[in-house]
Amino acid sequence: MKKFLFLCIALACVSVTEAKVSLPQLFQSGMVLQRGKPIPVWGTAQPGEKVTIQFNKKQYDTTADEKGCWRIDLPKMKAGGPYELTVNNLQFTDILIGDVWLLSGQSNIDVHIERVYPQYAQEIDTYENSQIRLFRVQNETAVHGPKNDIRPTSINWKPLNKQNAWPFSAVGYFLGKRMYEKTKVAQGIIVNSWGGTPIEAWISKDSLERDYPMLVKRAQFFQNDEYVKAQGQANIQADRQWQKILQDTDLGVLQNWTDPSCDDSAWQTIDQNNWSWRGSGSVWLRQHIIIDKVHAGKPTRLLLGTLFDQDITYLNGTEIGHTYYQYPPRRYDIPEGLLKEGDNVIAVRFINKYGAVHFIPEKPYMLCFGEDRCSQNPMPKDVIPLDPTWKMNVGAEMPNCPSGDISLQNIPTTLYNAVLHPLAPYALNGVVWYQGESNTGNPAPYADYLKKLMGCWRDRWQDQQMPFVVVQLANYDGRQQTGFPRPITPQTEPMNSGWAQLREAQRTTAKADPYAALAVINDLGETVDIHPLRKKEVAERIGLCFDRLVYNNKVSLSPEVISSEIQSGKIILTLDQLVQNGAMNTFEVAAADGDRVFHNVQAQADGNQITLTLPENFHPLSTAFAVRYAWKDNPLSANVRSLKGLPMSSFEIKVNK
């Protein structure tokens, strides 16, 4: 009996000792490891403990150092699998060797398949591929310095199918699909993004402190954990109290304005196309819609466009959907039997903490019926448009909500520390950086920020040639955020544009880096939506960049100006490729110094040259001209394209006389 007890204790001790070996969260069954490069495998153990790796019928041994850290670089391998990896008593299965891509930035890289599904419904419904694996890094911040690992995640090398991809990056989904179709090898897509974050949050302290000491000091301020905790609790409490007061005083709640029998005849009549409510609190809208017997029995979805800000939407007194912030499209499925023959009432309760409540124009507002009701490309065949006329009444007027989240994710270095630093040295094939919207208010330092970001990430991976694809900002008109003007008029006159200035920073930085490329998407945006849906096309352009950067394929990207000269009062721009001929829009010229007043000019493309005709009365004393193209937030009429249809980036260049 004693011998048996001793044996059990001994085995338990062995198990405890072996269990102390651990690997980062990136290492999971189903993972994709990078082909053609040494494969770092690392982790922690007891100091001095032996670590044994078995992989591909070979064994590799090392010993944990005095801090308990260990690392083994497995030899480079060709694409293939599945394989098994054993590290002491830990076992990982279903491992593929292929290409691994890191996608990072803010919300546009994170827009989910669920959001874009109506744009690509048939493709998403029918496509799945176990050779494409998805990994989503969980959001986390760190103010005290770099972390060694990321948080556990539920999307941990899941095979690509509709269910797994539903909450995953649409750009990541389509990039994985596109690259697999090109290479026929396994694809690992790591998405590491956080909506609304500035680039400074993704850069290391070491990269910022020399040139931007105030950014580092700002980050250090938030290292006071007691302050951060107290402020966070105060913000939560203030928000709860604001919400409670609103709920207790909202006439729409107290008088049940969701009830179809509610008399709204005395309410104000508004047209959603030219209405906004500049108040905080709640405002209610109602409209009646007559449904015939045939439609009353069909599966139905309500498309309520996009709204600012929070809405709770009811049909015939029953809540059918709610959205807690401004960006997501409102797509509410109506429960069977709720939509009835005859008169039906849609009621929308807006809750607004600040700003102006309004409908986003140019979005679909309708009832969709039948089996294709979830598609928006093409639109469903059977629809009933909503009347833009609504009855409106204020439920409660409140002061602006006093809560203000600290938002540590917006503080310099916090995301580099928490979710970027721990990923290295996991072997990658390339990086996608899709960010910039949050820096358009101060675009001047962005080029330097971007250079520092690429530099410190390459330093972290010890790979100075790590390929970066910079996705340029899409076209967008932020004026709709205020609710006015309606309709939004095209931007045609020369203007100072923070969006164009940031695009220029992206362009010049990528051009100056031999291991970077620019994916131009200034034709894939939406005037009224900062999160455009055409993510498959974005992924295709990213893929073209990687075709050139990684695989050394001879592919043409967006046209670029390679030289310029002045001839007989005209400016001749020579491009790196042929473009579509014809009259070209959105070119502007100014004196390169002095007051720099820009003037629209006529332009004509022929072959690989664009000729700008200067105005007859334009004779600046400057020794050079400044030439701009597509220098708008939303350059809708910009039309310089390659023969394959790729748009030219906006730019500003100097042309000497």
Task: Describe the predicted segments one by one.
Residues A19-P47, T93-L103, D110, A121, ...:
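Non-catalytic, glycine-rich low-complexity segments
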Residues Q59, D576-K657:
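C-terminal beta-sandwich/jelly-roll accessory domains of carbohydrate-active enzymes
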Residues G80-N89, A347-V348, T623-W631:
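Short, aromatic- and glycine-rich surface loops/edge beta-strands on solvent-exposed regions
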Residues K20, L26-D99, A356:
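Ser/Thr-rich low-complexity repeats and stalk/linker segments
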Residues W42, W267, I289-G317, I346-V348:
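Aromatic-lined ligand-binding clefts that engage carbohydrates, nucleic acids, or primary amines
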Residues Q34-K37, W277-S280, R301, L533, ...:
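Surface beta-strand/loop "capping" patches
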Residues K57-G80, T306, T313-P364:
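Beta-strand-rich ligand-recognition modules
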Residues L90-P159, I190-N274, D343-Y426:
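An acidic-aromatic loop/edge-strand motif
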